[in-house]
Each structure stands twice: as C-alpha cells, then as structure tokens.
Amino acid sequence: MNNHSYLKKNSFHEGDARELLKCIEEESIALSVWSPPYHVGKKYEEGQTYEQWSSLLTKVIALHYPILKPGGFLVINIDDILAFPDPRMPRFQAVNLKKHRVSVTREDILNALKLEPELTKYQLAKKFNCSEQTIERRLKGNNIRGGKYNVQTKVKLAGPVLEKAAEEAGLYLYDRRIWAKDPAWQNSQWHSNSYKAVSEFEHLYIFWKPGETVIDRNKLSKEEWASWASRGIWYIPSVRKNDDHEAKFPLLLPQRLIKLLTQKGDTVLDCFMGSGTTAVAALSESRNFIGIEKEPKYIQLSNKNVETFYISRNKEASKIKETNHSVTDEKKKAEQLELLLEENENSL
C-alpha cells in the first residue's frame, strides 16, 4: 500500500474495523485501546451469536500485529462475563414470588383439576379469581427470565477468547487491570429476576507485541505511580450520562493507559471509537489518534466531542495568556515603582 492510501491521523474513518485496519501504516501504532461489543442488551448487539462475536474479535486482533510498533500494546476493555443467545440453552425458570399478584400456585390448580378434570383455563381463572394468563403461566412454567418467546442466553467468559486470539496473532498477555466502576442496573427488573451480581467491574487486558519497550519512570509523578500506575485496581466512576451513546467509558480510563504506555507524539488507535473518548484522551496527552467507527452518527458525535475539546483547550490557553500578560504588567509596574523610589532616594 502506498503512503497516500494510509488512514489519516487525527481523523475518524467510517467503516468496518476488519477492513480499515488493513489501511493503517505498518508499525505505526504505539497503543490500540478499545472496547468491543459487550452483549449486555445494547441495541447494536442484537442478533449476534457467540460464534460471530468471537470471529469478529479474532479477526480484529489478528490485524493488529502488522500495525503495532514492536514493543507496542493492545488494550481491550471488556466485561469478562458476557451473555449470548443460544437456542440450545435450557430455559431458566425464575419464579419471582414478589411479582405474583395472586397467591394461587401450580399445585392449587393441579389439585382443582384432579377434582374437576373438565375445567377450562377460563373456568379455573374464575374459580381462583385471577386471569386466564395467570393460570397458563402457572401450568406451563412461563415464568422464565428473558420472556417465554425469547431465545435463552448462555454465559461465556471473554478472557480466554481474547488470549487465544492474541497468541495466534503473535501478541502476548502482558498485564491485566481491573476497572472498578459504579454498580450497573441496580434498579433494573433484570436484577430483581436473578441471583446474579450486578456488574461492578470490568477488565483491561493488556497485550504486548514483542520488541523493545521504552520504560520511562520519569513520565509520571511519584503520586501517580503510587495511586494508580502500579496498582491492579483502578477506581474510576462510570459515565453519569449515556444519552448520546449506549456504552461510553470515562475519559480517565484511556487517559491513564495513554500516559502509562505511550510517549508524547505517539499514535493511539481505537477501532470501535464510539463517542470519541479515546481521541479526546490522546489529544489531551499530546498524542495523535486514529479512530474507526462503522456508525455515521457516532462519527459525527466523535467530531463534535473533539471540536468541544479544542474549544475548551483554546479558552484555557487564552486564560493562561491573559494571566501571563497580567503578571508581566504587574512586574513592570513593580519595577517602575522601584526605580522611582530609588531615584527619589538618590535625590534626597
């Protein structure tokens, strides 16, 4: 591929990561950090099977080897336990007693049918003072998490898929961090229909491409090394508002990874860019970025967020400039006053 065909830095590129990653200059990426589809009920994940998901991740990871610098890193942020639709999975029968508006049980109905086998569900409903739907649910066991018509979900671990795909690509697990976030779905009906824990943390799988890695302990302060850079658990609050994108991670997350694993002037990649958070983090730390995103509306959102960053930074620079001018003016006034006092003293 000639130089003019490479994806432009500090730009967002619309398309499928499996195609556009082939258009990045070889050994030009110091860090790739991204979060793939999570399979936690988001609209854009609907209908994707476990096999399709693992195939997507395997292909994307494989395409990273040529473009990463030797000694560079790939970081994948992901919830390690994911749920996928699987028609072979037995249905989970969740009888939620709290939601029963009437006290009639399956045993009550069966006992009534023993005495009067000819009773219809409508007659049973009248007998127990409930709806015929309640009779049907009790008899047929339709108290099922996910609904009686939806395909049941199967829980899978993400980590083994990522590690296997990375090793096949020539990348090796270097480290793993835990992002401790706010508990998710605390007020959700899903939570009330399960004994499962709400999601309170995610993993950061850090993979390394063999080669020379620069270790510079001076690029972070002693406080940064002590509080997070050398720690396995990062306590970072979740994004408070996901009104413009369903799965945003906080700015501080890619910011820390960029500060820790790259140098100023390096290029950072996010091939599932979403709302542009990684791009803003890269720019804020004096790095370049390349963003890939298949949804046009999120390309627009990313551009908007980068524009907002530049406006904010320019305002900050103007304030600093004004402050410096003010300090300079005050210094000049002080020097002039000191000179006048000295002249006055000499004249006495």
Curated annotation (Swiss-Prot):
Keywords: DNA-binding, Methyltransferase, Restriction system, S-adenosyl-L-methionine, Transferase. The keyword DNA-binding applies. One of its GO terms (molecular function) is DNA binding. Its EC number is 2.1.1.113. It catalyses: a 2'-deoxycytidine in DNA + S-adenosyl-L-methionine = an N(4)-methyl-2'-deoxycytidine in DNA + S-adenosyl-L-homocysteine + H(+). Pfam families: N6_N4_Mtase. It comes from the Bacteria. InterPro entries: DNA_methylase_N4/N6, RM_Methyltransferase, SAM-dependent_MTases_sf, WH-like_DNA-bd_sf. The keyword Methyltransferase applies. Belongs to the N(4)/N(6)-methyltransferase family. This is Type II methyltransferase M.BglI. It comes from Bacillus subtilis. The gene is bglIM.
